[in-house]
């Protein structure tokens, strides 16, 4: 089979490497890919958001299957364009991708179908939003309705901070059209759990639960990022919690999407908070998480392509979906200044040493004509180690990461610390 993966980050590198294990694949491509992915697949220089060009290329090159993982092309309807050309794809169509593409759609869906989530209000008028947040009990969470690279969620400790967040989004256009509507919701307390699930719209198969570390600095301080590291499995996702999530959240969400006329197939990501009242949904994503994927897929024992095709063909209930015992830890190495302004073009050293004991997934890297690998993004690399237990996985990931050097390198030093405390 000829398979195309759409995207160019660390998540796509992890997916490409896992797909390489499949005996069915005869040719593997990635659009646009990056400097590391180029070692594992043929990179095609088309932006992931240029959905018409990708669909045309896939048809011209007779792709047998396309894996669409970034949120933008999913919300722009790439899966629909591929279907119109007779090409099966992994991922939801445009209508189903609204579960991530619009937080208003997602919150209203949960309210209509009784899926547990935080209390909230939605606003498309800036003055009404400002009037509400001036007196709302704090802390409060202000969310841009649309896609914002994982940075459109602001936790506001005071009413003044909430007013500033609303003003920046709705009046000053911080996130463009994505912030023209906002969701203002109650702040939930408890440990966070990320659960990626394969689904064909009816059957659902959760992957190993993980714990993301979204803040830029140690101790969960600093700005929200796309994610600075992940551990799996998540110790807060106990068998009891998992059973409640399946009954109260996972299956009802799939049923709700079917009832709305937009059944979801692909990877559905549940961002959960384990509160004193039980698990509640913080957010849905319509695709694999980044960097959760870089920690979860190394634990997967099944053939990834076979499982993906089962979600497309509606046969997931018969698919073999297995994850090994043990644990994994992914430490993200970022450019100094991320998630705000940062410099690129910094030469990267030490990869060969790191790769002796860990997987190194490339996110923001580029290969120059002379073969030199340089930084090209905010999150540059993800270093993942797998071991029999979590303490060993964390130690191995940091030991491998210590070998890697580039000017301005920033990382968190406490990935997995909260999970270790939970384990005692």
Language-model segments: which ranges?
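A conserved helix-loop-beta module that forms one wall/lid of the active-site cleft
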Residues: 90-152
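Active-site "cap" helix and flanking loop/linker of ATP-utilizing ligase/carboxylase catalytic domains
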Residues: 246-268, 285-357, 368
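Short acidic-hydrophobic, aromatic-tinged amphipathic segments that line or gate anion-handling sites
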Residues: 43-49, 121-125, 156
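Solvent-exposed alpha-helices and their adjacent loops that cap or buttress functional pockets
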Residues: 21, 36-38, 60, 90, ...
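Internal nucleotide-binding/catalytic subdomain
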Residues: 152-293
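ATP-binding N-terminal substructure of ATP-dependent carboxylate-amine bond-forming enzymes
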Residues: 1-95
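Generic C-terminus detector
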Residues: 365-370, 374-424
